[in-house]
Amino acid sequence: MSFSIVGDARPNSFEFETEALIKPSGFREYDARWWFGHPGSAQLPELNLNGVQALGMGLGTLIRRVGAGPDIVTGHDFRSYSLGIKLALVSGLMAAGARVRDIGLALSPMAYFAQFALDVPSVAMVTASHNENGWTGVKMGAARPLTFGPEEMSALK
């Protein structure tokens, strides 16, 4: 599976539906956040589901590279679109050979707890935290109880 990464694409266009859109500016120091958009928004999305799938493939590759193994806990927040984003992330993780333990709808601390309860070193929590509807993001880690820092985020980018 491979993706062509695009810089900009209009929603509901052929390019938007077939290429991976994932803005590099979304990779922050300790997590990743993008404007996913919502109906009626004038702001163009910074991420699409193919982009999330590409992120999952990169994350699945990175957790093995750092020696964390293939197992990872995933969860998603309450936003109406977060489940779809998580499923795209999981698809990419599995394409990279990850074994996913999904806990479903959760708060971030629940995902971190699940790392210990399920004895899984890595985590990927789909959440936009305190940001308004339309935003999405992923908090990630591969060495419980720590989440990714600048070095890991730079490697993932």
Where are these regions (language model features)?
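Gly/Ser-rich phosphate-binding catalytic loop and adjacent alpha/beta segment
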Residues: S2-R28, A32-K157
